[in-house]
Amino acid sequence: MDRLDLIKRNVQEIVTEGELEELLNKKKAPRAYVGYEPSGKIHMGHVLTVNKLIDLQKAGFEITVLLADVHAYLNRKGTLEEVRKIADYNKRCFIALGLDKEKTNFVYGSDYQLGAEYMLNVLKLSRSVTLNRARRSMDEVGRAMDDPTVSQMVYPLMQAIDIAMLGVDIAVGGIDQRKIHMLARENLKNLGFETPICIHTPILLGLDGTKMASSKENFISVDDTEEEIYRKLKKAYCKIGDTEENPILALFRYHIFPRYETIVIERPEKFGGNITYTSYEEMENAFVAESVHPMDLKNSAAKYINEILDPVRKVLL
């Protein structure tokens, strides 16, 4: 897989591809970042962007991970001390998932976001962003609020300034970050900063085919036990022929195939024996043709996801 294909793998959108190609021609080692609000357990939705960072590292990018403890504090996710502890947990998880510890720059928001230069830039940006625009940006990333605090309106402004102050060329995030990233693209140049390129990954559905929610237990956390993962995937939605909103297929596409050149679906000889696939497309076609059963996919997905997450469990013990 060539450099550009690796960058574009499993990406929903690049804003813009032309700017990306120009950057690759101009810089040998471009800089990209993702910001993570340390507010709870890491789940497979977060791992999707970690996978993209790993792709970018393989493509020669310098990677920064922002552990956004101040953002979490402003979003009322705990005291600064509490969210800093969660940030440390996040960092251990990301390294165990495959980010190169020596080549990843981990930055805590509190290391620079309380400085005068940073805050002055946030205030400058606040003069050109309407309250409605800030609120829409927050709502888009799943933080819809009936009665938001001023701190939560500052959140998207800080996220835009993060891109500038970290000196990165590319902002990576889920497609739910798009409105905040567009805010940055439209406004940072007016403050004297470069316009960032944005890479957006899809948002994974929960295991039941609906939006992920902690109350539904419809997602996989990176520290789930092997037994919990087998149990959750056994109950997961995997309707024969449904390739659009199928969480089991999504696990193969976004998490398993990027890490394994060959996938073996294990099944008894009386049901045809093991099947080997070398690409996601090959496996999806077999699923549509009903030559592989949903339960066989579920069992194999559980096996591979457990292998991927085993280093995380060892680190967290």
Curated annotation (Swiss-Prot):
SUPFAM superfamilies: Nucleotidylyl transferase. A motif ('HIGH' region) lies at residues 38-46. One of its GO terms (cellular component) is cytoplasm. One of its GO terms (molecular function) is tyrosine-tRNA ligase activity. L-tyrosine binds at residues 33, 155, 159, 162, 177. ATP binds at residue 214. Keywords: Aminoacyl-tRNA synthetase, ATP-binding, Cytoplasm, Ligase, Nucleotide-binding, Protein biosynthesis. Homodimer. This is Tyrosine--tRNA ligase. It comes from Methanosarcina barkeri (strain Fusaro / DSM 804). The lineage of its organism: Archaea, Methanobacteriati, Methanobacteriota, Stenosarchaea group, Methanomicrobia.
